[in-house]
Regions:
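Non-transmembrane, aqueous-exposed alpha-helical and coiled segments at domain scale
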Residues: 2-12, 23-49, 60, 74, ...
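Conserved phosphate/anionic-ligand binding catalytic regions in large, soluble enzymes, centered on
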Residues: 8-26, 309-328, 371-379
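Alpha-helical support elements that line or immediately flank enzyme active sites
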Residues: 17-34, 326-338, 383-391
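Short, mixed-charge aromatic SLiMs
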Residues: 44-57, 89-97, 349-361, 402-415, ...
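Functionally critical mobile loop/hinge segments
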Residues: 49, 386-486
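C-terminal regulatory domains involved in ligand/effector binding and gene-expression control
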Residues: 75-283
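Accessory "access/gating" subregions that flank catalytic or transport cores
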Residues: 221-370, 478-486
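Active-site-proximal binding-pocket segments
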Residues: 339-347, 354-381, 386-403, 413
Length: 486
């Protein structure tokens, strides 16, 4: 059964599709070698990255993430320092610790291939893992796809390839396959839904809020204690990430652009007047009157800079957009009257339901639909969550979510230097405040709106399909080619 909490996974920066996903896929390959008793036969492993993974893989740490996964690491528990330096560590003796069980010869220049002019037809984020024995005979081969938000899907070694700028054949992409499927919730979910229209209708029919409906689905297959524990863990990491980002002693971000960390200086300046991070008192309900935009900017910058630095974060729903939902949730926590832990639960369940619709009916992958699928989806999710905790009806929640995505349609993914820094970090801050403004507009209305969220999601999907590949996480267009890397 699909859980909406899968939209929030604890992992590492800087990218969910280019760091988290490849690590998960590599770990799965290594685990299958272990399960099939093939580790002892394996003398060498080759990693081939295609399309967007190849074009921006160095900046996103895709190579390092895949190597860490082959060694048996997972994003939620990997030592971030070890992952950051794994290439240098392996180079010390030219070995890699396969599945944590056997040291095999590993020559980075030979065994990591960036295939920049080809991509898999099914998805631009394809990768191939090959294990060979001492005689160079193939032991095992797997193809995997990182489909956004840290989610992966297994392919087949014979999956077709196309040129990097070619349009995939009709029906070849995973987004098409997902759209045609029935439901991801399974028969045990009491309230399955595949569109926002269905979701709001179910809420109205059963007199439930979106969060209450989602809670019923989540607890149909596991205990409420387990669900609450997962939510608490997500919130705990989000809070720690904001705190770390605000107090970091590192002056610049890694990667070569020398982008300064601004959150610590901004925090000191704001805290000199009133340090909201170090107190529990709330101000009056500020949603309709004041956005406290500077603090929201700070929260988003803090998380985004932690992500860019390879720190521990929550994918929400992607790493490139990971600052938006924590920023808006911190806004609720610090600035809204009567904010409480149950409100955090309501916020995340509601936001997760909206994120599920984006993933199911379009894509949350920047390599597939551009940044509208990452920042746009997160803005919509954050708006929905905030609208829910300030008393919005399901119709007002949908309205806020629709406003959040409508004004991010067409947003390109053009990271300078292939790094999740420019324009990604500032873009998170802008979108966080946009989400709050979307809630303000929705709450001043009665929930009626002309454009539905389902229509906006479909529009995002179509826009992404029409978008040129150079604007979809390849660093071959936009700011990526107009800003000189110094």
């Amino acid at each position: 059964m699909f859980s909406v909490l899968d939209m929030f996974t604890i992992g590492v920066g800087p990218s969910s599709s280019h760091t988290v996903g490849p690590m998960v896929a590599a770990h799965a390959f290594a685990s299958s070698l272990q399960a099939d008793h093939l580790v002892d036969r394996t003398a060498r492993v080759k990693i081939t990255l295609y399309g967007s993974l190849a074009l921006t893989g160095l900046g996103h740490g895709t190579d390092r993430a895949a190597m860490a996964g082959l060694e048996g690491n997972l994003p939620a528990t990997v030592d971030t320092d070890h992952m950051m330096h794994i290439r240098e560590i392996c180079a010390l003796d030219d070995t890699l610790n396969l599945a944590g069980l056997k040291r095999i010869h590993f020559d980075y220049d030979r065994d990591v291939v960036f295939e920049q002019w080809k991509r898999m037809a099914a998805h631009p984020n394809g990768m191939r893992f090959q294990a060979v024995d001492a005689a160079a005979s193939l032991v095992d081969e797997q193809v995997w796809y990182s489909i956004g938000g840290g989610f992966v899907r297994k392919g087949a070694p014979e999956d077709p390839m196309i040129g990097i700028h070619e349009r995939p054949p009709e029906g070849a992409s995973f987004a098409d396959a997902d759209k045609s499927s029935s439901t991801d919730f399974g028969v045990e979910a009491p309230y399955p839904f595949s569109s926002c229209t269905e979701l709001v209708s179910l809420c109205r029919e059963h007199h439930l809020s979106i969060a209450e409906l989602v809670w019923a689905n989540e607890t149909a297959s596991r205990s409420g204690i387990q669900v609450r524990s997962d939510i608490d863990a997500i919130w705990r990491v989000m809070r720690a990430c904001v705190d770390h980002g605000c107090t970091s002693a590192e002056p610049t971000l890694p990667g070569g652009l020398d982008v300064p960390r601004r959150a610590p200086k901004m925090y000191r300046r704001l805290a000199s007047n009133s340090d909201v991070l170090r107190r529990d008192s709330r101000r009056k309900d500020a949603v309709l009157e004041s956005s406290d935009a500077a603090w929201v900017d700070l929260f988003a910058l803090a998380v985004s800079e932690e992500n860019a630095g390879g720190g521990r974060i929550v994918t929400a729903p992607t790493n490139g957009s990971a600052g938006i939902i924590p920023a808006v949730l911190h806004y609720y926590w610090h600035f809204v009257d009567n904010a409480n832990e149950q409100g955090v639960v309501t916020f995340l369940l509601t936001a997760g339901a909206i994120g599920y619709l984006f993933k199911r009916n379009a894509s949350i992958s920047g390599a597939e639909v551009g940044c509208q699928g990452e920042v746009g989806s997160a803005c919509s999710m954050a708006a929905a969550g905030l609208a829910a905790v300030v008393g919005g009806t399901p119709e007002q929640v949908e309205n806020a979510a629709e406003i959040g995505i409508e004004h991010n349609l067409g947003l390109t993914c053009d990271p300078v230097g292939g790094l999740v820094q420019i324009p990604c970090i500032e873009r998170n801050a802008m979108a966080a405040n946009t989400a709050i403004n979307a809630v303000r507009m929705a709450m001043l209305g009665d929930g009626s709106h002309i454009v539905t969220l389902d229509q906006a999601i479909e529009t995002m999907k179509q826009t992404g399909e029409d978008m040129m590949a150079k604007y979809k996480e390849t660093s071959k267009g936009g700011l990526a080619v107009n800003v000189v890397e110094c």
